[in-house]
Amino acid sequence: MAAAPFHDRDGWVWMDGEFVPQREAKVHVLTHAMHYASCVFEGERAYDGTIFKSRDHSERLHKSAKILGFGIPYAAEEIDRAKHELINKMGFGDAYVRAL
């Protein structure tokens, strides 16, 4: 049996500075990222509830965004805090986290 599609799963995402149920997280079809594949992201591993080199990832996310001329409205500290809270909220120990 196939796993449930990502849009139809229980869970949470951190979006626009707040936690949103995964099923309610929506991105507008006319967003720049959809039309031009303009996005930056970091793929991060968490072990025992701790993201490996979380701050390095958050700072690199900011640097990547700057290269493409994007502004990120959240400081690296806020992004780190949100990632940590999300892992706890989801009850994950070992996980893959993608900040974008």
Task: Mark where each language-model region is.
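Conserved alpha/beta cores of soluble small-molecule-handling proteins
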Residues: 1-100
